[in-house]
Amino acid sequence: MQANGFSFGFYDEPNNLNGQDVGADSLPSVAIESDSLGHMLKYIPEKLSYARVSGLGHTFVQRELWDVKMQLMEQDDSIESDDKLKVLDGCNDLVPNVYEGGYKTWECSLDLANEIKKIDVVKNNLTTVLELGCGSAIPILSCFQEFYKHRIPCTLVFQDFNVDVLRYVTLPNLLLNWYFCTQEHDSSEKHGTIDVSPSLLQEFSDDLARTNIYCEFLCGCWSEEMQLLIQRTYGDHYFSLVLASETIYSLPSLENFLYMLLKNTKNLALVAGKDLYFGVGGSILEFNSRLQKLVDDPNSLKAIKTSTQNVGRSIVYWEKEFPPSNIDSSPQSPLPGSL
């Protein structure tokens, strides 16, 4: 049975949620899996169409959603693919326990990406990064841009509920932003297409390997099983920086999100969200209140306002150990292993 979906009304009707409760009484039955960069590259098509992202203080490109739709139409005519296309057509921002909004770029992810540029991930040695519910991955890829520019070894872990989001949006965005870091291009061009040859993919993979930029992709819901998957490779409290945006809208999933945040943060966590999600119960205030009860030092939390227009937006800082005590001239090495 197809799950009922709904659409957030933040753009046309800022003070109204058009739909229904996104909460679920139980965890969705989706596979929890990890994948490597090398294996994921097979999902990259021969051409990628992109658009520059507005609203950022730095250059960033992302894959066009119509390009994702074209790829899905060409490779699969199943009912499952039809459901994916309905999501891409904009009928539903969310389908509870099926699709969690990862194809779209949300305003709070732009706020978070801009904030990342202020904290200087290189200087502060925040070189092990996890983004929970990454979607288009603009925040973590803004970190990638800094690490790549300075040739800094790092570990980047991209987590999303949907494996298709990782395959068709997250990874292409990583490739595109690497490409624009390495190739001369017209900075005024807002849209374009790049040819993706096997040699380009090999160059991409080899270049990240030479720089010791290690990437891993995790799909599935926030849960003990997901944490065990992370723990087997990294252990607990491994990530110097944990990022998330638009992940606190659903009260039923908030407990699991907090669990993942607490288990994985070593130094600093940044969580961006709307001050209130009308109709679904989530809010920055509720998130901050619950987190205060769980951290050792409530004074390690602070919230900054990023917008007061329409539905207000904020970013919560959890400075667990920040600046890190291990800051020195040598960046933290990523985990050993192949890309």
Swiss-Prot record:
<dbReference type="GO" id="GO:0180023">
    <property type="term" value="P:cytosolic large ribosomal subunit assembly"/>
</dbReference>
<protein>
    <recommendedName>
        <fullName>Histidine protein methyltransferase 1</fullName>
        <ecNumber>2.1.1.85</ecNumber>
    </recommendedName>
</protein>
<dbReference type="GO" id="GO:0006417">
    <property type="term" value="P:regulation of translation"/>
</dbReference>
<keyword id="KW-0963">Cytoplasm</keyword>
<comment type="similarity">
    <text>Belongs to the methyltransferase superfamily. METTL18 family.</text>
</comment>
<feature type="modified residue" description="Phosphoserine">
    <location>
        <position position="338"/>
    </location>
</feature>
<dbReference type="GO" id="GO:0005829">
    <property type="term" value="C:cytosol"/>
</dbReference>
<keyword id="KW-0808">Transferase</keyword>
<keyword id="KW-0539">Nucleus</keyword>
<dbReference type="GO" id="GO:0005634">
    <property type="term" value="C:nucleus"/>
</dbReference>
<dbReference type="GO" id="GO:0018064">
    <property type="term" value="F:protein-L-histidine N-tele-methyltransferase activity"/>
</dbReference>
<keyword id="KW-0489">Methyltransferase</keyword>
<feature type="modified residue" description="Phosphoserine">
    <location>
        <position position="333"/>
    </location>
</feature>
<dbReference type="InterPro" id="IPR029063">
    <property type="entry name" value="SAM-dependent_MTases_sf"/>
</dbReference>
<comment type="function">
    <text>Protein-histidine N-methyltransferase that mediates methylation of target protein on His residues.</text>
</comment>
<dbReference type="GO" id="GO:0032259">
    <property type="term" value="P:methylation"/>
</dbReference>
<keyword id="KW-0949">S-adenosyl-L-methionine</keyword>
<keyword id="KW-0597">Phosphoprotein</keyword>
<dbReference type="InterPro" id="IPR019410">
    <property type="entry name" value="Methyltransf_16"/>
</dbReference>
